[in-house]
A protein has these predicted regions:
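Hydrophobic membrane-insertion alpha-helices, especially the h-region
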Residues: 15-31
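Short linear S-[DN]-x-LW-Φ motif typified by the pepsin-like aspartic protease active-site region
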Residues: 33-103, 114-122, 126-128, 135-142, ...
C-alpha cells in the first residue's frame, strides 16, 4: 500500500511539473509573437505594454535607411516599432535595466529599411539612436523628454524638440552632413561645435567655417531655469537651430 501511495505521489508531481512546463512554453511563445514577430499581415510590428511605466530609455542599436520617430497616445502600449511588409529589416525588442533595446534583423526582402517608431506621450523618454541612417526624422514636440543622443553618423537629421524643462540636452556624437533642430518657445540655446562645422546657424545668425571647440552661448543661458544644450561632439557640415510655434 505504501509503495502504491508513493508511486501515486510521484505521478502527481510529475504531472504537475509537466503542466507547469507546458504553461511556461505557451507564455514564452505568446510573448515572442507579440513583442518580436508582430503581425506580418500589416508589416513587421513590435509593441510593448506600458503598465505603470513612467520613464524609460529607447535605444536603436542598428542602422537603417530612414528612421521616423514621434510620440502619440498608444493606449496600453509604451511603444510601437514597425517596418513595411517588404522591408529588408524587421524590428526585435529586448528589455534591460529600464532600456528598451531595438535591433533590426534581416528579412530576405529587398525593400527599403524604413523604421517607424511611436512612443507613448505620457512616458518620459531618453533617446539614444545608433547604427546610423541616411535620414532621421524625430518629431518630439509633444513628448516628455530627457536627453537625446545620436551615436552614429547620418546624412540628414531633423529634430523637433518640445518646450525645454530644465536643461534639454541633445548630443550629436556620430557626425552628420545636415542637422536641423527646431525648438519650441523662446528658451535660450547653447550650441557647441566640438568637432567643427562648415556652418552653424542659430536663430537666424550664421557663422561659417566654425572651428572645433567653438561654443555659442547667449548671455541669458547660464541663469536660465529652462534651456537647451546642443553638443555636436563630432563634425557636421551644416547645423541649423531655429524655432517653431510649439503647437505643431
Amino acid at each position: 500500500v505504501e509503495n502504491a501511495q508513493a508511486t501515486d505521489g510521484r505521478r502527481f508531481w510529475w504531472w504537475l511539473g509537466g503542466a507547469l512546463l507546458v504553461l511556461v512554453v505557451v507564455l514564452v511563445s505568446a510573448w515572442t509573437w507579440v513583442t518580436v514577430r508582430g503581425d506580418g499581415r500589416a508589416g513587421h510590428v513590435v509593441t510593448g505594454s506600458a503598465d505603470d511605466l513612467r520613464e524609460a530609455t529607447f535605444v536603436l542599436l542598428d542602422g537603417a535607411d530612414v528612421v521616423r520617430l514621434r510620440t502619440d497616445d498608444l493606449g496600453g502600449d509604451a511603444y510601437r516599432v514597425s517596418t513595411s511588409r517588404d522591408s529588408g529589416v524587421r524590428p526585435a525588442v529586448s528589455l534591460a535595466d529600464g532600456n528598451i533595446l531595438t535591433s533590426l534583423r534581416g528579412t530576405g526582402q529587398d525593400g527599403p529599411a524604413i523604421v517607424e517608431v511611436v512612443l507613448h506621450h505620457s512616458v518620459r523618454w531618453h533617446l539614444r539612436l545608433g547604427g546610423g541612417a541616411k535620414e532621421q526624422h524625430l518629431d518630439l514636440r509633444g513628448a516628455q523628454l530627457g536627453d537625446v543622443e545620436f551615436t552614429a553618423g547620418a546624412s540628414r537629421i531633423e529634430l523637433t524638440l518640445p518646450p525645454a524643462e530644465g536643461t534639454q540636452r541633445t548630443v550629436l556624437s556620430g557626425g552628420a552632413n545636415q542637422v536641423v533642430v527646431r525648438l519650441a518657445g523662446d528658451a535660450p540655446v547653447r550650441v557647441r561645435a566640438g568637432g567643427g562645422a562648415g556652418s552653424v546657424t542659430v536663430d537666424g545668425s550664421t557663422q561659417s567655417g566654425v572651428a572645433g571647440g567653438t561654443v555659442l552661448t547667449p548671455p541669458e543661458w547660464e541663469s536660465a531655469t529652462d534651456r537647451y544644450d546642443i553638443d555636436a561632439t563630432s563634425g557636421v557640415s551644416s547645423l541649423t537651430v531655429d524655432r517653431t510655434d510649439g503647437d505643431g
